[in-house]
UniProtKB/Swiss-Prot annotation:
It comes from Chromobacterium violaceum (strain ATCC 12472 / DSM 30191 / JCM 1249 / CCUG 213 / NBRC 12614 / NCIMB 9131 / NCTC 9757 / MK). Keywords: Cell inner membrane, Cell membrane, Membrane, Transmembrane, Transmembrane helix. Belongs to the UPF0060 family. This is UPF0060 membrane protein CV_3485. InterPro entries: UPF0060. The chain crosses the membrane at residues 12-32, 37-57, 67-87, 91-111.
């Protein structure tokens, strides 16, 4: 668990990775659901490429990184719901985030040889 000393770095990477993925999915949603300009697909490509690159910077094995990242993704997506979509999360959203983050903590903080 030597990576634990870099926990703030890993947490920051997870948040940046989630933001890149959400932007990469939100922009095409705007094009397809809201009739926005097709030009939004250009930054979509950049956001998804950034997302893929950021995943390579995580210190754990790829499968474990993806699994743990899911907990942070859920939390960032709910924050996006509130800050971008203007929908205030309810207690069930908060509970879901807490459970997802607890699962992420089990995966990332478990003692391994």
């Amino acid at each position: 668990m030597e990576w634990l000393t870099g926990l703030p770095r890993v947490a920051g990477l997870f948040v940046l990775t989630a933001l890149a993925e959400i932007v990469g999915c939100y922009l095409p949603w705007l094009v397809l659901r809201e009739g926005r300009s097709l030009w939004l697909l250009a930054p979509t490509t950049l956001a998804l490429a950034l997302f893929a690159w950021l995943l390579t910077l995580h210190p754990a094995a790829a499968g474990r990184t993806y699994a743990a990242y899911g907990g942070v993704y859920v939390t960032v997506a709910i924050a996006w719901l509130w800050l971008v979509d203007g929908v205030r999360p309810d207690r069930w959203d908060a509970l879901g985030c807490a459970l997802a983050l607890a699962g992420m903590a089990v995966i990332m903080l478990a003692p391994r040889s």
